[in-house]
Amino acid sequence: MNDIYRIYLSALRAFVRGSAPEPVPQEQWAALMELARINSTLGILSHVYLNHPDLTPEQLRPVLRRQCLQEAAMYAARGNQMALLAAEFDRAGIDFILFKGFVLRNFYPVPELRTYGDVDLVIRREDRAGSDELMKRLGYEPRDTWEPAYSYQRGVEYYEVHTDVMEVDVSDKADYIAYFSRIWDHTCPSQTLRLPHALEFTPEFHLLYLLTHIAKHISVSGAGIRMYLDIAFFLKRFELDWQWIAGELECLALSDFANVVFCAVEDWFGVECPLPRRSVPAEVMADFLEFTLSGGIYGYAGRDKGTVFLKQQDRSREEKVSRTRTLLHHAFPPVRNLENRYTYLQTKPWLLPAAWVHRLADSRTEWARFAGHTREILSADMDEVKKLKRLYRELGL
């Protein structure tokens, strides 16, 4: 483990456990802050070292203080805006499920330092029209408007209103879409916002979702360390039914992956999971840490998209990497990739060729995006692709 990674992990561990972080050599502060920035934890890093002024250069303290206060103020304001929006949903009689960042932030010692790009909530499919009308009436501008996630923006506020939470299968080992179609069977009254129509996932189901969500991000591009920090605080927060969780992980074919995640959470943050764990080879854990930290919050930092696209092809087989097949997949996606956007495919899959034309005719940005992806795929480092595919297998995915 290099020095920057070790110091960075010590700061996150200090945030989790209330301990002291490692000292930072003067010449390494810039690299440390950049690592925290790409992983969306700069406010946490600032908070930790401000609490230990003996470890922080005097000239750097105003910078850290400003970063910490700005982040806390912004996310406090966004939290207040979400509470107001939730009250509007409640007044309209629309049931909604809170999950991910807006719930998880409350498990952090300083909730306002848990960053998030958008706020997610789930509604019933039959409430889609009513929720869309409500969002527009409140001044939110629609962004993406196809199933199962509809996004809206107003200033710095950004919301995703879901009718489902799993639109793709993480792998071919289980039917993840079907499993997570039963989300309403695993809800309880919200402890975050105590409103009659506000719900949350039960803790056990929420943990299963978080693990699957991480696996999904890894299968696409990557998952930064903030997602594992969420798991650490989740484990500290709840007494869980681990027998039920273990059985469901088997159903989801995620037992091996969860084992790696729980080993990482213990190694990185000092938070243990009650489930019995199997040892993971040190070289796999080292590669996993490098992959997690270097790629940033969603795995794209310092990693071109062509590499990511090629990695997704035949993920379980390291030797199968074809630029041509990947290009064809992006030009002519299968039905499962388009049926949520062009819903006529759900009942008329034979209209797939029409959807290909429809997609490219939607806007000039589709052509520009495809041209950019083509350049990236043709120039991608194939050795890096094979390395990522090997790691994917070693993680149990």
Task: Give residue spans per PLM region.
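Conserved NTP-donor binding/palm subdomain of two-metal-ion nucleotidyltransferases/polymerases, i.e.
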Residues: 1-117, 123-397
